[in-house]
Design a protein with these regions (language model features):
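Multi-pass alpha-helical transmembrane bundle typical of ion/small-solute transporters
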Residues: 1-204
Length: 204
């Protein structure tokens, strides 16, 4: 099976996830900037973080499948596993918003981010197994340093929220900083993948 249907389905699911998240945003009661900041500020911040993450996954997913010609059943199921965890973003994002970054919602949000990262790694591994050890994707991924750093930051954030200043906001603040830092790291594109995609397009 070629990758077109899988990519189209994934794009549609990600678009729906973003739509659901933005529909969860609540307009402030007043008409001033102060009303916006105090009543909708947390919601806008959590939406922004989650939107960036969805954008990162869409971008990486798009580039990854440019290096793949066909998919099998294992790839389809691994892709569904990734979409499952990403589809929970509207729920976990809304909970963090409504709780104003309370400890348990932040921990669950971090677990969702970690699970999505693991699911992406599983998808990547299944594709490499299908394509072979010398495949373009395997060369592009290399030692996957970013993936290892990401998992470490997610775990650091989760553990910080669970153990540091349990009655205050220091632990959750560290957790959010870890999650934002991970997103910033992934916003910077991996030039190796871009080069390999261009090489594949030229060879076609």
């Amino acid at each position: 099976m070629r990758t077109g249907r899988l990519e189209a389905f994934s794009d549609g699911v990600l678009a729906i996830i973003i739509t659901v998240m933005v529909l969860e945003l609540k307009a402030p009661d007043g008409h001033t900037l102060s009303n916006l900041v105090h009543q909708s500020g947390v919601g806008l911040l959590t939406y922004l973080i989650s939107f960036v993450y969805i954008g990162i996954y869409w971008n990486n997913h798009h580039h990854m499948f440019h290096l793949v010609e066909r998919v099998n059943g294992g790839v389809l199921w691994a892709n569904l596993g990734l979409l499952f965890w990403l589809s929970l973003f509207p729920f976990t994002t809304a909970w963090v918003d409504e709780s104003s970054f309370a400890r348990t919602p932040v921990v669950i949000y971090g677990v969702d981010l970690l699970a999505a990262g693991v699911a992406y790694l599983v998808l990547q591994t299944v594709i490499i197994r299908q394509e072979g050890a010398e495949s373009a994707l395997r060369r592009a991924v290399g030692r996957d340093v970013k993936g290892k750093i990401s998992a470490t930051l997610y775990l650091t954030g989760i553990l910080s929220a669970l153990t540091i200043d349990r009655n205050g906001h220091v632990g959750t603040g560290i957790a959010v900083a870890c999650f934002v830092g991970t997103a910033i790291m992934w916003i910077v594109p991996d030039r190796r993948i871009g080069r390999l995609v261009r090489q594949n397009e030229k060879s076609d």
